[in-house]
Amino acid sequence: MLLSKYFLPVLKEEPSEAQVTSHKLMLRSGMIRQQAAGIYTWLPLGLKVLKNIENIVRLNMNKAGALEVLMPCIQPAHLWMESGRFDNYGKEMLKFQDRHDNTLLFGPTNEDMITDIFRHNIKSYKDLPKNLYHIQWKFRDEIRPRFGVMRGREFLMKDAYSFDINEENAVKTYNQMYKAYINAFRDLGVFAIPVIADNGPIGGNLSHEFHIIAETGESTIYYDKKFKILKDNPDIDVEEIKSWYAAAEEKYEVNKLPISEQEITSSKGIEVGHIFYIGSKYSVNMNALINDEYGKLTPIEMSSYGIGISRLVAAIIEANCDEKGIIWPSSVAPFKVSLINLNIHDSKCVELAEMAYKELSDKNIEVLYDDTEARPGSKFATHDLIGSPHQIIIGPKKAANNIVELKDRKSGVIEDIEVGSLMSVL
């Protein structure tokens, strides 16, 4: 992509309305623009990151055997009345009437609707297990939306729902999805800790939250110090990770620790995922029954699994930034490479830049080629801000000798590379 053709409205000044780093950087780098309190337009750069995260999550759900569906944003209120949850959300749930005076709502979650879909289409234990997921925009009318997309009113979620014949099978499915979540966060390039948590209004009696460690996190989590090795050793077996202690603040009890208090550390975390074993709460309330192997009608066992796709964008930034801007993990970066031509009027610079651009594009490496008239200092600031993992810098002096500079955004290390070796080094 040529920067001269791209829509990248970067801000030089720090936006006064932003309180946390991720919100400031998302506005400054031209990823989002606010349309109303807690509601944002995703501009091209931000949308690329959002789609990259969405695709990685989708891939891991598919690997876990979940099947993608797409439920509507707008839901009939009678389903929520039937499940007994209509009044639980209060003013957070946006309700309205259509022209026929039917009460509708903008769904904050989908347990009620997926249970309705299940009960009308699955009747026998032979059709189990089933695991359905969708990726859809949600709305909760927060009293005080803040921190940009971290706590907005409109947000993108991946929600999955599993259905099993009994508790034993439901817990097996839950554990499979736990592993899928660990793998998804690994693939996203983030350090997420699974902690024992409350189920909240969703219901149930088994629950884990997944937290990214960040100083701006709103939750305090307590966890075994072993988790710190996950940062440098992401390939540790999931079964081993499951044996390590970690708990949300409301579940942390010093006198009931399975390990010594000295082995525990605490941090602020941003919740980016939550999984629940719900049991038969919804199936009983909504009469979602199936015939078991003895021909007896029995309520289905359910679990619910959520990942905040749009929140993850902000959380990843909070954990991967410096004073210059964002440092994207390669897996979610909008562009893997920023190609910076420092002098677009120098024929050798143009020759090397266009050669590199073609080679990168031919290898399907997403590259943003800065072919603008901007001054070198401005170009450096822009590309440090948007956070491409690698920068190829082409200036007249070194270009004359077929040399370009390759900068690693995270470490800041710059090395001279002969242009013919560029692809192999990358």
UniProtKB/Swiss-Prot annotation:
Has the keyword Cell membrane been applied to this entry? no
Instruction: Please list the GO terms describing molecular function.
Output: ATP binding; proline-tRNA ligase activity
The reactions it catalyses are: tRNA(Pro) + L-proline + ATP = L-prolyl-tRNA(Pro) + AMP + diphosphate
Q: Does the keyword Amino-acid biosynthesis apply?
A: no
The protein's predominant localisation is: cytoplasm
Keywords attached to this Swiss-Prot or TrEMBL record, sorted alphabetically, are:
Aminoacyl-tRNA synthetase, ATP-binding, Cytoplasm, Ligase, Nucleotide-binding, Protein biosynthesis
Pfam families given in the database record = HGTP_anticodon, tRNA-synt_2b
Q: According to its UniProt record, where is this protein located? A: Cytoplasm
Supply the InterPro entries for this chain.
Answer: aa-tRNA-synt_IIb, aa-tRNA-synth_II, aa-tRNA-synth_II/BPL/LPL, Anticodon-bd, Anticodon-bd_dom_sf, Pro-tRNA-ligase_IIa, Pro-tRNA-synth_IIa_bac-type, Pro-tRNA_synthetase
Which EC number(s) are documented for this chain? Answer: 6.1.1.15
* GO CC annotation terms, alphabetical: cytosol
What Gene3D superfamilies would the database entry show? Answer: Anticodon-binding domain, Bira Bifunctional Protein, Domain 2
GO biological process terms on file: prolyl-tRNA aminoacylation
Subunit annotation: Homodimer.
Entries under HAMAP family matching the protein: Pro_tRNA_synth_type2
Q: Explain the purpose of this protein.
A: Catalyzes the attachment of proline to tRNA(Pro) in a two-step reaction: proline is first activated by ATP to form Pro-AMP and then transferred to the acceptor end of tRNA(Pro).
Question: PANTHER family under this entry?
Answer: MITOCHONDRIAL RIBOSOME PROTEIN L39/PROLYL-TRNA LIGASE FAMILY MEMBER (PTHR42753), PROLINE--TRNA LIGASE (PTHR42753:SF2)
Q: Which NCBIfam families match?
A: PRK12325.1 (NF008979), proS_fam_II (TIGR00409)
Report the family membership.
Belongs to the class-II aminoacyl-tRNA synthetase family. ProS type 2 subfamily.
Q: What is this protein called?
A: Proline--tRNA ligase
Gene that this sequence comes from: proS
